[in-house]
Amino acid sequence: MTATIIDGKETAKEKREQLAKEVEELKQKGVTPGLAVILIGDDPASLSYVRGKKKAAEAMGMHFQLDHLDASLTEEELLQLIDQYNANDQFHGILVQLPLPKHISEKAVIERISPEKDVDGFHPLNIGKMLLGEDTFLPCTPAGIVELLNKTGVNLSGKEVVVVGRSNIVGKPVGQLLLNENATVTYCHSRTANISEHTLKADILVVAVGRANFIKADQIKEGAIVIDVGVNRLDTGKLVGDVDFEEAKEKASYITPVPGGVGPMTITMLAHNTVKSAKRTLA
């Protein structure tokens, strides 16, 4: 068996075309969806992510504002800037690019963003609503993963899902979203005694650990759907995921590539949340 590639670029393109139409409809009603992004310091990966967000948002017709600030910025100055955006009706989404300098509390920043403008889906109120299965802003990468799984046409209900990784940004929330879809979810992490024992039972395997080629074919059930969230750069400069793609694609039924799998969906779902927030202002 050679796996069918789940094309994140194509799925993201379709979704972005739909969002562009929705943005145009909102503009005709006098509302231009606005996204404010705050970037502190000069982390190369963060700069690259922010450029991608700007390009995507503007291509969909959204208003995009970037505040690129020096790493010496104090926590209080950042919180005051967030307050300004919270109070500004032109902006429907506020995103503070992580990671932050060590002297700034990530928790304080996330909790300062208004839950109504928390398009990253990280605010405790929105996390709580997600746990309860209520309508809210879902974290972008997990929501993108669910979209990709839905594209396969596979019914998630009753499926054995194994999530390798338990970060607050991907691992924990993606498991919860799949639980909300009536899947049976197991989490594996650095303290899990025998990861293979769990991964070999997975109908759907989601890997988000940030370790190049961590999962090999002998840890994957025949015919499983494999979602690879990792993006790792080898010494050769090549980008690879957390799953050994060349091996795994001979065992899985569906697999996401790296790059071009989950990544394009993350920015797309950020735009989706921003448009959703803008629509709420008309309700």
From Swiss-Prot:
The EC number(s) this enzyme carries: 1.5.1.5, 3.5.4.9
Q: Which GO terms describe its biological process?
A: L-histidine biosynthetic process; methionine biosynthetic process; purine nucleotide biosynthetic process; tetrahydrofolate interconversion
Q: Does the keyword Secreted apply?
A: no
Q: Name one GO cellular component term.
A: cytosol
Q: What SUPFAM superfamilies does the database record attribute to this sequence?
A: Aminoacid dehydrogenase-like, N-terminal domain, NAD(P)-binding Rossmann-fold domains
**Pfam families in the record:** THF_DHG_CYH, THF_DHG_CYH_C
User: Which parts of the sequence bind NADP(+)?
Assistant: 165-167, 190, 231
Substrates-to-products reaction catalysed? (6R)-5,10-methylene-5,6,7,8-tetrahydrofolate + NADP(+) = (6R)-5,10-methenyltetrahydrofolate + NADPH; (6R)-5,10-methenyltetrahydrofolate + H2O = (6R)-10-formyltetrahydrofolate + H(+)
| UniProt keywords, alphabetically | Amino-acid biosynthesis, Histidine biosynthesis, Hydrolase, Methionine biosynthesis, Multifunctional enzyme, NADP, One-carbon metabolism, Oxidoreductase, Purine biosynthesis
Pathway, per Swiss-Prot/TrEMBL?
A: One-carbon metabolism; tetrahydrofolate interconversion
- GO MF assignments: methenyltetrahydrofolate cyclohydrolase activity; methylenetetrahydrofolate dehydrogenase (NADP+) activity
Q: What does this protein do?
A: Catalyzes the oxidation of 5,10-methylenetetrahydrofolate to 5,10-methenyltetrahydrofolate and then the hydrolysis of 5,10-methenyltetrahydrofolate to 10-formyltetrahydrofolate.
HAMAP family linked to this entry: THF_DHG_CYH
Q: Which NCBIfam families match?
A: PRK10792.1, PRK14186.1
Q: Which family does it belong to?
A: Belongs to the tetrahydrofolate dehydrogenase/cyclohydrolase family.
Subunit architecture: Homodimer.
What is the protein named? Bifunctional protein FolD
Q: Which organism is it from?
A: Bacillus pumilus (strain SAFR-032)
